[in-house]
């Protein structure tokens, strides 16, 4: 991903380089994994990068770990990220961490949502809340129309689009979706961004490559525009007080993510007197770099 290493050299706000796959990089002396004096049973809710990092670190410290994932695979959104052009290494990173989880003998339960009933049944000593985030669907007139889809579903192959495509959101996910559509043979989509620039959530290395892709692929980007309506064949936006129309066969939302609802977990743990540790996107939707470091640090301190 280059965000912890290459971007670490360029970003003066970062005290040292780090690594999504190894959060101890740059601070090895303070991140020694030592056996716990009090091994406990820990239920980890969510098998994305944060959940796997927490589970792996907890297991290495001697805790008994039960890792539950609501879907049929480990890796979470990192698997999706690795399905876009030029990012296969990210999918490999998620798959390799999944292999480490299995090799450590962690009790992995796929297709298993962590509910209050499951917590009462397993009676863990603690629960790590790593349920992640889900895409934001804005409340825009027309957002529920059948030609309106979500970027994650395109990347995951659940939805196929064709013809003219307008992508709402010019951050990393929106632009990588545009890149994926161009690579699959579609007409370069139009990307609409509310802010004054695209790629603002990308690290410097990835941003440089994406800006080159935008130019080479002739992806049209319109900034400082607010989408106000979606119709059967049109996305309507407002820019500088003027209404602009963008003909489309499909409109795609890529406007970011928000933490998944953890209300049931919090209530169940509070009722049973069980420690609840919330990390990663379940705490706040961010990059995987922050999610894995937060999970690692929490598991180390547990």
Indicate residue ranges for each PLM-predicted region.
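Active-site/binding-pocket entry motifs
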Residues: 4-7, 11, 24-28, 133-135, ...
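Generic secondary-structure signature for well-ordered alpha-helical cores
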Residues: 3-10, 24, 102-106, 219-220, ...
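Rossmann-like dinucleotide-binding cores of NAD(P)H-dependent redox enzymes
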Residues: 64-104, 179-225, 283-285
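Short, hinge-like loop/turn segments at secondary-structure boundaries
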Residues: 83-87, 127, 145-146, 207-210, ...
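Membrane-interfacial segments at transmembrane helix termini in multi-pass membrane proteins
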Residues: 21-25, 31, 74, 80, ...
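Rossmann-like dinucleotide/flavin-binding elements
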Residues: 36-70, 74, 109-123, 130-147, ...
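Cysteine-cluster motifs in flexible loop/terminal segments that predominantly coordinate metals
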Residues: 1-39
């Amino acid at each position: 991903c280059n965000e912890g290493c290459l971007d670490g050299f360029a970003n003066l706000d970062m005290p040292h380089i780090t690594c999504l796959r190894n959060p101890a990089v740059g601070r090895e002396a303070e991140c020694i994994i030592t056996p716990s004096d009090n091994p406990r049973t820990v239920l980890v809710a969510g098998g994305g990068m944060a959940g796997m990092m927490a589970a792996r670190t907890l297991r290495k410290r001697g805790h008994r770990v039960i890792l539950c994932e609501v879907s049929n695979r480990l890796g979470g959104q990192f698997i999706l990220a690795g399905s876009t052009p030029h990012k296969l290494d990210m999918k490999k990173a998620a798959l390799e961490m999944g292999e480490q989880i299995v090799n450590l003998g962690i009790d992995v339960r796929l297709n298993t949502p962590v509910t209050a009933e499951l917590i009462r049944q397993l009676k863990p000593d603690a629960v790590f809340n790593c349920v992640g985030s889900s895409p934001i669907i804005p409340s825009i007139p027309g957002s529920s129309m059948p030609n309106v889809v979500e970027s994650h579903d395109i990347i995951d192959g659940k939805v196929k689009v064709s013809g003219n495509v307008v992508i709402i959101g010019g951050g990393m996910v929106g632009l990588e979706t545009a890149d994926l559509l161009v690579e699959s043979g579609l007409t370069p989509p139009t990307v609409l961004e509310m802010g004054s620039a695209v790629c603002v959530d990308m690290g410097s290395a990835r941003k440089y490559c994406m800006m080159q892709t935008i130019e080479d692929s002739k992806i049209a980007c319109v900034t400082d525009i607010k989408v106000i309506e979606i119709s059967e064949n049109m996305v309507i936006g407002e820019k500088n007080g003027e209404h602009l129309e963008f003909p489309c066969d499909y409109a795609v939302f890529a406007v970011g993510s928000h933490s998944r609802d953890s209300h049931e977990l919090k209530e169940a743990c509070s009722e049973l007197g069980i420690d609840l540790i919330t990390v990663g996107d379940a705490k706040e939707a961010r990059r995987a770099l922050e999610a894995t470091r937060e999970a690692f640090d929490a598991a180390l301190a547990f």
